[in-house]
Amino acid sequence: MKAYIIHENEVWTKPLESHLNKLEVGYEDWHVEKAKIDLSQSPPEGIFYNRMSASSHVRGHRFAPEYTSVIINWLKSHKRRVINDGNALALEISKSLQYLKLNESGIKTPRSIFCSSKEQLIQSARDFKKPFITKHNRAGRGLGVKLFNNQNELEHYVKGPNFENSIDGITILQEYIEADPKVIH
């Protein structure tokens, strides 16, 4: 059976392709910016592996997750097997959903407030334990993670020219948890 690799970043798919070649498994590269989906056609038979990233926008693929959703919905409507389906994609692009699922599973997450505007961010920080961090709801690679020791630092950043909004417009204000130097990550 043929494998189809849905992605937007060749760097991440090379190790998989190398392994598939060693196993002599046929595969096809489905870079989302090259894949054309015709809903009147049936997708090919095979196994589809979704390797979409929340940080695709930093590589110039702003709408890759949305287009991947189109692809996955099309595949699922034809009963194709998708590894990392729409549920995985939803988790990948939303820290809010990640935190909710972690908490549901009994894994404690830091206190987090999700803000859709600069005003919400500044207001929410007033009653927040210091220090705290901000981060992007939809991101990877540590995008948008900043440490603030007090309200003034945050306001200066948010009102200044270096403020970096999340690609989905949601910035997280989060309790800062200092790393334990005895723990190796």
Language model features by range: what are they?
Residues 1-4:
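Extreme N-terminal starter segment of soluble prokaryotic enzymes
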Residues 8-111:
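Conserved N-proximal alpha/beta basic substrate-recognition cap immediately N-terminal to
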Residues 31, 84, 114-116, 149, ...:
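Short loop/edge segments at beta-strand edges and connector loops
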Residues 34-38, 120-123, 153:
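Short acidic active-site motifs
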Residues 47-51, 133, 172:
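Structural motif
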Residues 87-89, 116-120, 138-141, 151-153, ...:
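Short acidic/polar capping segments at secondary-structure boundaries
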Residues 97-142, 147:
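Hydrophobic alpha-helical segments and helix pairs
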